[in-house]
Regions:
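Membrane-embedded alpha-helical bundles of multi-pass transporters/translocases
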Residues: 1-185
Length: 185
């Protein structure tokens, strides 16, 4: 009965999908950036700059996110963050950037969007629990939190391996002094 409720709860399935995509984008981006800055941009120091900029921006966003969400709504704030991230990642991908600083700017903007969504994902879980109660007449807080937490673990595991698989798929060779043009393109 509980399993049937879980697979029938579209809100839960949507938030699980969003969480997995979020984790894949965060962890795969972190994995790929190490190789991107070393092999493509040939500027590993720029990666340090990216790391130093990210934390203060996240902390700054944390201080104002409640006010922004109160004004516009948590769902709207989260959706805007994900659209911002998708747009920035898309621009970075299709422009074939060669300047690491432009890439960092886009990556930081995308990070702000992802962080905005990530800050409210647990608030969305309470909405999923409320939806479950309205739709099925059962609260099931523990089950929903447990299923969601487990799905995040799956997302983290997938993200950890996916970066390596992606590098292998494009032909990256860790032992090579220079990567082939195929890998760099």
């Amino acid at each position: 009965e509980t399993f049937k409720t879980i697979i029938s709860n579209r809100a839960l399935l949507a938030i699980i999908g969003a969480a997995i995509v979020l984790l894949l984008s965060q962890f795969m981006g972190q994995t790929m950036n190490q190789y991107l800055f070393a092999s493509y941009f040939k500027n590993i120091n720029a990666l340090s700059s990216l790391s130093m900029v990210g934390l203060p921006l996240s902390l700054g966003l944390a201080t104002v996110s409640g006010v922004i969400a109160s004004k516009f709504g948590k769902k709207e704030f989260s959706a805007f963050g994900m659209f911002l991230a998708a747009a920035c990642y898309g621009i970075a991908y299709f422009m074939k950037l060669t300047n690491p600083w432009i890439f960092i700017g886009l990556y930081v903007l995308a990070g702000i969007g992802v962080t905005g969504f990530n800050m409210f994902i647990w608030a969305h879980i309470t909405d999923v629990i409320d939806y479950n109660e309205v739709k099925f007449g059962e609260r099931n807080d523990g089950v929903i939190y447990g299923v969601y937490s487990f799905s995040r673990k799956i997302g983290q595991a997938l993200a950890g391996g996916l970066g390596g698989y992606a590098l292998g798929f494009i032909g990256f060779n860790a032992a090579a002094q220079e990567q082939t043009t195929q890998v760099l393109d």
